[in-house]
Amino acid sequence: MKNENHPDSAVAHTISVIGSSWTCLILRDFFLHGPRRFQQLQDSLKGTAPTTLSERLRSLEKNGVVDRRFYSMSPPRAEYVLTAKGRELGPIVGAMRDWGRKYGR
């Protein structure tokens, strides 16, 4: 049984939302560039399979971190944008960047 009062449960929940491979890099792209289309993310994240990117975006959307917005254009266009909940992850992504700069190669 899950103990919600355990201090690590909040960390475990955060990891369940953003801890999958590529997810933090997807978030980084949103913080660097703002709203993104699928192909823009695909081009930026060299090496990620389209199915993986699609799964990560679906998970972020399901968890309320990103919204998918559709535009009535020809051809139809969808764009992903951070929600208020997603923008609150900015300090976490920033701290990861700072740590990487300090201790990376």
Residue ranges of model-derived segments:
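Short beta-strand "wing" residues that participate in macromolecule-binding interfaces
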Residues: R68
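Residues within the DNA-recognition helix of helix-turn-helix
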Residues: R56
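N-terminal helix-turn-helix DNA-binding core of bacterial DNA-binding proteins
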Residues: K2, S9-T52, M73, E79
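Glycine-centered, phosphate/nucleic-acid-interacting loop/turn motifs that mediate DNA/RNA or nucleotide
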Residues: G64
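Hydrophobic alpha-helical core bundles mediating ligand binding, dimerization, or RNAP-core interactions
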Residues: V11, I15, V93-G100, G104
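Basic, amphipathic "hinge/linker" alpha-helix immediately C-terminal to the N-terminal HTH DNA-binding motif
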Residues: G19, S72-A95
